[in-house]
């Protein structure tokens, strides 16, 4: 597929995703057409984002399974080293987080500064997403490039609810961390 045609097709979908009243029927129809024409769903557009990044960015989580089933890899990073899962976590979109994980997103993948989705959930103070990621195998012992763990970030953010959850869940005594 020619680059100009690809950019035109991506622009079409991105513009539809950005509409206030997103017409999911139109988007799904267009995605099916692109799939039939062997559109590369892993191609990157502006700032290195794939179609899946734009789906997350515009809160259209209902089409996540379709985009992934058509071949979009949920573990591709954009130019800011964010996967769609990192984006969904920072947006606090728990439904998107669930769908991405169920469709193969890596819960332990390091992004910018080697921060995992769990690091970001803790930094954002989102206990529900923190619990969800841990239940799906997120490793609480992974550290970022500053050698900081999720517990370190919970302490930095003074998030006592997440600190207590982590201590109880992993039987960590005060002073042991």
PLM segments and residue spans:
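Intrinsically disordered, low-complexity regulatory segments in ankyrin-centric signaling systems
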Residues: 1-58, 65, 69, 174-177
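Ankyrin repeat A-helix N-terminal signature
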Residues: 18-23, 54-60, 87-93, 120-126, ...
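Ankyrin repeat structural motif
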Residues: 23-33, 60-68, 93-101, 126-134, ...
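Leucine-rich solenoid repeat scaffolds
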Residues: 140-173
């Amino acid at each position: 597929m020619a680059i100009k045609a690809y950019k035109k097709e991506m622009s079409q979908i991105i513009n539809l995703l950005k509409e206030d009243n997103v017409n999911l029927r139109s988007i799904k129809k267009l995605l099916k057409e692109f799939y039939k024409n062997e559109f590369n769903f892993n191609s990157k557009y502006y700032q290195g984002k794939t179609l899946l990044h734009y789906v997350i960015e515009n809160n259209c989580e209902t089409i996540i399974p379709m985009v992934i089933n058509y071949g979009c890899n949920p573990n591709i990073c954009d130019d800011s080293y964010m996967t769609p899962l990192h984006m969904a976590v920072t947006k606090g979109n728990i439904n998107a987080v669930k769908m991405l994980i169920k469709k193969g997103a890596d819960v332990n993948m390091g992004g910018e500064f080697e921060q995992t989705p769990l690091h970001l959930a803790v930094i954002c103070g989102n206990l529900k997403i923190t619990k969800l990621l841990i239940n799906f195998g997120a490793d609480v012992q992974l550290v970022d490039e500053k050698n900081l763990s999720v517990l370190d970030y919970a302490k930095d953010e003074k998030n006592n609810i997440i600190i207590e959850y982590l201590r109880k869940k992993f039987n960590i005594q005060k002073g042991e961390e």
